[in-house]
C-alpha cells in the first residue's frame, strides 16, 4: 500500500461511532479532508516510504486528537451561554473600538471651578462673555448646595463651591443658589483641617486664598475665616510665593502657568509669550484670568472653543490628548485585552510619536512645559512598540541622581515615580540615566510602602498600593502577561477612579467600566480553556504514568502555568501544550540518574528507534518506556501542527530534541539547550515560516536568549544552594550578568531595523527568557499563590 493511500485511510472521516459530537466531528473532518485530498495527489510527504512505524504514530495521534476533543467539556456544557458571552464580548469590543476611533483632544469631565473663572470674563460691553458658562453653573448645583465631583473630597467641594458662588454673585444671579452654597461652606469648612493633604488639588494653597479675597471684595461673608485650617493654607501660600522668583516666572515657561489666577504682580506682556495654542498650560481658569487682564484674542479663541465643546462648562485642563492616548494604551495592555485593538493602539502611538519632542511631553501636544509622568509613560510604550526614543528626554528631570515631576520642583507624586520606575526597567545597556532613575524611584517607592504612605496627589484609584506593590515585587522581566492582567483586574477601578487636578476630574476613555467588563469576560474565557487543558494534560501525565519517573503533577502544573501565563490566547492551544509537555519532559529526563553510556543509549534509541540490550532488566525497560513517551509526544505534537497549520514538523522537531539530548548526554549547558528546544518547539508549533529560522536576527536572538536562560538557570540553582547554606557572593555577581544580558535581549526585541523579523516572533524570545527569569526570581510561596490566582481563582 502506498504512503498516500495509507494516509487517506488513517485520516478517514470521523463519525458518531468515534464518540464525538457533531460539532467536534466537523472540527476533525474539516482538517482531515484537506490532508486526504493532498495525500491523493501526492501533496503530502508526512513520512518516509516504508517507515510504517510513522504511519502507526499518525494513527495513534489521530486517536489522541479524537479523545481530546471528547474531553472538551465546554463543547457539551451550556453552549448557549458561550454564545451569549461571545456576543457580549463582540458588542463590548465594538463599543471600545468606537471610543478609540473617536479620540480627539480628550474626553474629560467638567470643572465647576474653571467654569466659574470663565464665567467671570466680561465682554467689551461689560456683560458676561460666556453666558452659557453661568447657565452651566446654575444647572449643576448638587443637592447639598455644593458643586463638584460625585466623589466627596472636601478640598474639591469647597473650592468648586466658593468659585461658583463668586461667579453667580458677580453677575447678581441666583441668590438662593448662592445662599445654599454658602451654607455648605459654613457647615463643612472646618473639615479641611482633617483632610489628607495628598488629596489637595494642584495649586489649591495658592488659588484658594486668592478666591477668598475675591469673595470678600464682593461682600461675601466667608465662614470660619479665622480658623486654624484657613490660616495654615494662607501660610502655605505665602511660603510658596516667596520661593517663586518672579523673574524666573517671566523668563521661561514653568508649571506655574497653570495657576496664574492665584498670583499677583504679573507682567502680562512677558507672560503672553508663553501661551501654547492660545492657553496657559492648557488651563481654562488660568487662561480666563489672563483674558480678563489682557483681552488677548488667542486666549479668547481658546476659551470659545472649549466652552463650545463642553456646552458651557470647561474642564480643569484641556486638551489632554497625549495623556488620554497613552494611559488608554497602558490600561488596555495591563488588562490583557490589547490584542483586540492592535490597529487602534498603533494609531494612538503614531499620534503620540508625531508630537514627541527631545525634551519629552506633557498631557497635551505642543505644550512648552513637560512633566516626567507623561514623558515616562510615553517613553515606555513607544519603546516597547519599536519606536526610536532617546533617554535624553529625562535629563531635565534629573539633578544629582534625584528625579522630579516638573523641572525645578522638589515634590513628588507616587504615580509619577511609579511610572519612572516602570520605564527604567526597559533600559538598554549603557543607559545610565535610566539606571539612576531605577535606583531613585525604587528607593522612593519602597520607603513610601514601608511608611504606609502610598496615597497619590494626582489620582484616587481603587488600589494604588497594590499596583505599586506588584511592580516592586514582580519586576518587568518576571511579569508574565496573564499574571499582570490577573492582578490588575483587581486593582483597576474603572469608572470609579478619579483624577486630581485643580479639581477632581474623570477620564472616561482611560478609566472605563467597559474596558473592565470586557477584560473580565476575556479572562474568564481564557481561564476556562486553560482549566480544561490542564485536565487534558493531567490525563496525558497519568496515561503515560509519568509519575513513575520521579516528578509529581506539581512540576507539570508549573510548566503549564508558565506556558498559559504567556501564550494565553485560546487560539494558541498548540503552542501552550507543546511548551508545557516539552518543558516537563526535559525536566523528567534530566532528573534521571543515568551514566554517560546510558544517556548515549537513550539518545540513540530516540534517534534510531533501536532496541536496547535488555540484560539489565527493569532499568532499561523504564528508560525505554520514557523514550517511547517522548517519541509519541513528538509525533502527537507534529500531527496536531500538521492539522492546524498544514506543516510537517516531525523531522525538525525530532532534530531539535536530538540536539538537547546530545547536550544532556555530554553534560553541557542544559539551560541554554532547554531554551533553544522550547523556542524552536514553539516556533514549529505555531507554523512559523521556515525562512525565519535562517534569518540573521533569528540567530542573534536565539544566541542571546539561550545565554541569559543558562545564566538564569545557574542563578536559580545557586540560589537554591544558598538557601541550604551555600555561598551567596556568586549569586550576586550572576545577577549583574543576568541584568546585562536581559538588557541586551530587550534591545534586540524592542528595536526595529529595515530587515527585521516580525514583532510576534521577536516577542517569543523575550517570553521564554521571561519565564526563566520568573522561576529564578520568585520564591516557591509566591509561585504557588500565582498559579492558584491565575489558573483557578474566580474573578468577581
Swiss-Prot record:
Q: Which SUPFAM superfamilies match?
A: Terpenoid cyclases/Protein prenyltransferases, Terpenoid synthases
Specify the pathway: Secondary metabolite biosynthesis; terpenoid biosynthesis
What the protein does?
A: Involved in the biosynthesis of ent-kaurene diterpenoids natural products such as oridonin, miltiradiene, eriocalyxin B and nezukol, known to exhibit antitumor, anti-inflammatory and antibacterial activities. Catalyzes the conversion of (2E,6E,10E)-geranylgeranyl diphosphate (GGPP) to ent-copalyl diphosphate (ent-CPP).
Per the record, what about its domains? The Asp-Xaa-Asp-Asp (DXDD) motif is important for the catalytic activity, presumably through binding to Mg(2+).
Q: In which tissues does this protein get expressed? A: Highly expressed in leaves, and, at low levels, in stems, but barely in roots and flowers.
Annotated binding of substrate, by residue: 240, 457
Q: Where is this motif: DXDD motif?
A: 371-374
The note filed under miscellaneous reads: Abietane diterpenoids (e.g. miltiradiene, abietatriene and ferruginol) accumulate specifically in the periderm of roots. The ent-kaurene diterpenoid oridonin, main constituent of Isodon rubescens, accumulates in leaves.
Its primary localisation, in coarse terms, equals plastid
The highest taxon in the source lineage is Eukaryota
Which keywords fit this entry according to its UniProt record? Chloroplast, Isomerase, Magnesium, Metal-binding, Plastid, Transit peptide
Positions of Mg(2+) binding: 371, 373
A single Gene Ontology MF term assigned here is: terpene synthase activity
Q: Where in the cell is it found?
A: Plastid, Chloroplast
Q: Which cofactor does it need?
A: Mg(2+)
Under which main EC class is this enzyme filed? Answer: isomerase
Q: Which Gene3D superfamilies match?
A: 1.50.10.160, Farnesyl Diphosphate Synthase, Terpene synthase, N-terminal domain
What Enzyme Commission number(s) appear in the record? 5.5.1.13
**Name the record gives this protein:** Ent-copalyl diphosphate synthase 4
The GO cellular component terms are: chloroplast
- What are the boundaries of the transit peptide? 1-23
User: What family does the database annotate?
Assistant: Belongs to the terpene synthase family. Tpsc subfamily.
Q: Which InterPro entries match?
A: Isoprenoid_synthase_dom_sf, Terpene_synth_N, Terpene_synth_N_sf, Terpene_synthase-like, Terpenoid_cyclase/PrenylTrfase
- A biological-process GO annotation: miltiradiene biosynthetic process
Catalytic activity reads: (2E,6E,10E)-geranylgeranyl diphosphate = ent-copalyl diphosphate
